[in-house]
Amino acid sequence: MESNAHIVEYWKTQPEVLEACLKNSLPLTENFVKLYQEVRPTHLYLVGSGTSLNAEETAVSFMKEMLDIDVISMPSSYVHDIRGDRPMFVFLSQGGSSTNTLKAMEETAAYPFITVTGEETCEIASRSSCHMVIGCGEEPVGPKTVGYTASV
């Protein structure tokens, strides 16, 4: 288990990670914007587990307001009730290897989707033709705090 001092030092990196995300928001979101414009979804589904799901829940209201469409967050272990003529999925996994998220990707493969992870090279990115990196890098501690900040 990590020492508390190590975790606290890691948590202190959040402001610089957030600042980098904001500075690089255009290149970081380019693939999402491109897919969104191609699909013009009627519903946007944010799918993840754990900290990723918590970050998605936080982002739902903002995304609804900005995109003016239905935005639904759901756990990757229970993808259900897909609605709309043109649904689109966002699969978020800071660590990039969530088995539930990989399973959800397989179950919804008929729909357009983008994967979002903390690093470019990971299992989830390798199974996606449209990928976005959130810029938090690898999380060396259990709680995905920096990943949460970058995801939101």
Regions found by a protein language model. Give the residues of each.
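Glycine-rich phosphate-binding loops that contact phosphosugars or nucleotide phosphates
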Residues: 37-152
